[in-house]
């Protein structure tokens, strides 16, 4: 516990808040190129084949990103836009691919929550 005099001399230094999405450099989205597209299995209580992609960003960082929605057209060398947001049951996956932007197509036949999956309004 510091004395009043020590606080007057030094003051308290505010704690640094560690970023949850360090590769974004405080940007809302970042562009990158897929270096590997693959599936992986989630943590213990869940079971599935989750679609993920390793992406090299424009700031030369490599991150693992989740591809949301049913079905995708991504492959190696696809140019994607990513946003922050982790996937709770996939360790190390802290980013999401934005659907319907750049080389990523929107989810086909999507009726609800379309804006999140880049789907156009059905006729």
Curated annotation (Swiss-Prot):
It comes from the Bacteria. Keywords: Methylation, Ribonucleoprotein, Ribosomal protein, RNA-binding, rRNA-binding, tRNA-binding. Residues 1-24 are annotated as: Disordered. Residues 9-19 have a biased composition (Basic residues). Gene3D superfamilies: Nucleic acid-binding proteins. One of its GO terms (cellular component) is small ribosomal subunit. InterPro entries: NA-bd_OB-fold, Ribosomal_uS12, Ribosomal_uS12_bac. The modification 3-methylthioaspartic acid is found at residue 89. GO terms for biological process: translation. GO terms for molecular function: rRNA binding; structural constituent of ribosome; tRNA binding. Transmembrane segments: none annotated. With S4 and S5 plays an important role in translational accuracy. Interacts with and stabilizes bases of the 16S rRNA that are involved in tRNA selection in the A site and with the mRNA backbone. Located at the interface of the 30S and 50S subunits, it traverses the body of the 30S subunit contacting proteins on the other side and probably holding the rRNA structure together. The combined cluster of proteins S8, S12 and S17 appears to hold together the shoulder and platform of the 30S subunit. Part of the 30S ribosomal subunit. Contacts proteins S8 and S17. May interact with IF1 in the 30S initiation complex. Belongs to the universal ribosomal protein uS12 family. This is Small ribosomal subunit protein uS12.
């Amino acid at each position: 516990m510091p004395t009043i005099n020590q606080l007057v001399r030094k003051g308290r230094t505010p704690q640094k808040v560690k970023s949850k999405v360090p590769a974004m450099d405080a940007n809302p989205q970042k562009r990158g190129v897929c270096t590997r597209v693959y599936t992986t299995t989630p943590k213990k209580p869940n079971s599935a084949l989750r679609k993920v992609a390793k992406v090299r960003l424009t700031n030369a960082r490599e991150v693992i990103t989740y591809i949301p929605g049913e079905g995708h057209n991504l492959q190696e060398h696809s140019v994607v836009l990513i946003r922050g947001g982790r996937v709770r049951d996939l360790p190390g996956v802290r980013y999401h691919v934005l659907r319907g932007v750049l080389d990523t197509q929107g989810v086909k036949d999507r009726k609800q929550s379309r804006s999140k999956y880049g789907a156009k309004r059905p006729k």
